[in-house]
């Protein structure tokens, strides 16, 4: 907690108000407290002299209330109740409802008056709509914004009349009211619900969000993927709002927790400890707002409303305001802000008055943010594992190319010389790295000849470079690349200021555009060390998908290579940083010293007007000849050339061994296997697969009923042991395995699976008894097929038939009589069968099957893979028919279950009655009657009984009713 704290200056109690919302008018004269029955208007200049009431008839509480922020409309305020908004007018000591806004279909969550237009009011609701109303015409909203999720907060930008922000669970959307169809920018701000949202009072791009995830984050919506800073808290944050002075922030914790009733004042430049704590409320703070500063006074007043039904006004004097100020080297800070990030046109909302003030001649530079608190450093170490840890690594990893910069690096001497040429100015600087660098040890910067800039500019550059280096090394990060960027950016900004001053000597400095707020930032270069391990983007690629299509993309035909074919491809995405902005161009590195390291400089230089893309790193637009047309001024060479190639989807079904038409024509009739094989042969003939016609013809003969095996193993050798039996079928399966024809494999396995089943016998877990599943050999003689559904699973060269050995299989069977079993089967059989005749019958059941039961698992994989292909084809009924023949039982349950032992025979019981002794499983420890209904038991001693008896016993007792001495309430929960 902060060392400084204070109690309130003014306390006013409203015991009967039951107000849930509060607002202070823009003049600082009145506050409105919104209850269910009355609205209380409090005179803040004389809060003890009574208050006025406005009666309201509603069963709904007021969710949000706000005065109009414009002086000419200061007597209007809006209050939301359920699905409507009432507009009140307070004048001459009396108030009345002026009009009502109705349009939402769900509860209104928030409202906000426009900062620049007094007639506009925005409302948000959980019905996913955000409405902008004009109070001059309240029949319907003038603008409707729609989102997927409901909005909990809505706030107008304090510097841009067209910009507003809304929060949706943990996300923030930035809107332009002129483009209501879609949001301008999206921020994935928090992992939990956002409770508070507030724009910076001096910058149109910066906002703060407070969330249920115990944090307040600061954002520049031009950089939606990276927050500027974070304020970690111990509990969820209800509201976080900027102060009207300096760089302060006030936070309040979530009301539902009832832990912290104080308000905390923070300096956004130092978020480690609050600079002030407002202590006094006995219950959670529901709302707080700032009162307008009185004329001639430097003090501010903070007005708060709490659930303890007290209104308190806190005085914030100039001394407290200075705690939030950052007055160190104001001139340098103003200079830093003058070279701040220039907005991207597609992400920045400009007003008509300021459009001409923004230029993009120098691209953009990443915005700076403040160092995070120390307790976050440990959490971010994992993000820095890819960063260089030594100077040698830093020199070798730098892959950034900056225009007009020469760098000579000497890792042995731990130094480098940087030369920058900008306009008529030249800067040469010596950078020396201490031995502890980059572990909280910053390098030193020294200007050397020839350097042509002024002493004032040298001081400013040194200040900026030292600050940038310190911010990096505090977190153990390398700083050479960020310092190079800052050096060039500052120097070019200084030169531009000189040029603009000389071209317009009558222009007033900063007469139109105020400087951006002094908000701390840290340079995070795009495509820098963080991307050193990310492969360089592709300009072409191809991918197979499971439905028989090939998706690929290539470079446009209008482009050709910009570099020679021998030029090495960049190794990582960090090389693309040279093309991210117009400010950056190839860096030329001198390598006079033999031991120096040379940076990558093989990319082509591009002009300022060329568009930046991944393709432009490899290719450049072909120079097209221009022909004059008959029409004057037309030029065929000026036509637009596409900067990206097309994405093409190609049907490659003709190259695959599976056919969708066969999938539609194939049948599986388990009642007539002969008819199934004959019709499938006819279907194969229709699509021109003569090889499959022969296969299905052989299958028709092999499934003839006259070849059916006898039940007695002593009568004859089963047909499956014949060379044209199982051996022929296995050779067919091996052949189509080599062809990756999973369609034929699955259909053959399904047909012969159905042929081996006894008529009328259901098969939930396989064609053989469950106990024989222990005898299935784990290895497979077929290639591995998975049910991924991708064509790559059938065309992967890694799928081979090396495990399929017909000769070895035959030798194995010829070495012993057909009725004998292998030693492995005998070993398992001796454990499973007590009667040798039973084992012999079971072995006969396996030998008479055309499909080897040892490969059942692989046959199931064929069917699952083919079923996945049928699903992608949209043949779901065919898929269901095939999957009916999957014979493997479901995986056994591996979770935790509570079992019961019978109190009589000590057998495991799954119900209330024992299946062995037929007695009831357990008795109540109190009434000694069998328990059949609701029961509770101690997990330590195992005693228990009827729930009602146990509850009544433990109302007055602490030990087990059986007298075992167990303290059941402490050991387990009843």
UniProtKB/Swiss-Prot annotation:
One GO MF term: zinc ion binding
Region annotated Disordered, chain positions: 350-374, 831-852
Keyword Methyltransferase: no
UniProt-annotated binding residues for Zn(2+) 2: 927, 946, 949
Residues that hold Zn(2+) 1 according to the record: 902, 905, 914, 917
Residues annotated as domain RWD: 393-494
Binding site for Zn(2+) 3: 938, 966, 968
Start and end residues, zinc fingers (C4-type): 901-920
Record field: compositional bias (Basic and acidic residues): 835-851
Biological process per Gene Ontology, one example term: cellular response to nutrient levels
Residues reported in the UniProt entry to bind Zn(2+) 4: 943, 960, 964
Subcellular location: Lysosome membrane
Annotated control of activity: The GATOR2 complex is negatively regulated by the upstream amino acid sensors CASTOR1 and SESN2, which sequester the GATOR2 complex in absence of amino acids. In the presence of abundant amino acids, GATOR2 is released from CASTOR1 and SESN2 and activated.
Keyword Zinc-finger: yes
WD repeats: from-to residues: 57-98, 103-143, 146-185, 189-229, 232-276, 278-318, 319-362, 668-706
Quaternary organization: Component of the GATOR2 subcomplex, composed of MIOS, SEC13, SEH1L, WDR24 and WDR59. The GATOR2 complex interacts with CASTOR1 and CASTOR2; the interaction is negatively regulated by arginine. The GATOR2 complex interacts with SESN1, SESN2 and SESN3; the interaction is negatively regulated by amino acids. Interacts with DDB1-CUL4A/B E3 ligase complexes.
Function description: As a component of the GATOR2 complex, functions as an activator of the amino acid-sensing branch of the mTORC1 signaling pathway. The GATOR2 complex indirectly activates mTORC1 through the inhibition of the GATOR1 subcomplex. GATOR2 probably acts as an E3 ubiquitin-protein ligase toward GATOR1. In the presence of abundant amino acids, the GATOR2 complex mediates ubiquitination of the NPRL2 core component of the GATOR1 complex, leading to GATOR1 inactivation. In the absence of amino acids, GATOR2 is inhibited, activating the GATOR1 complex.
Protein name: GATOR2 complex protein WDR59
Organism of derivation: Homo sapiens
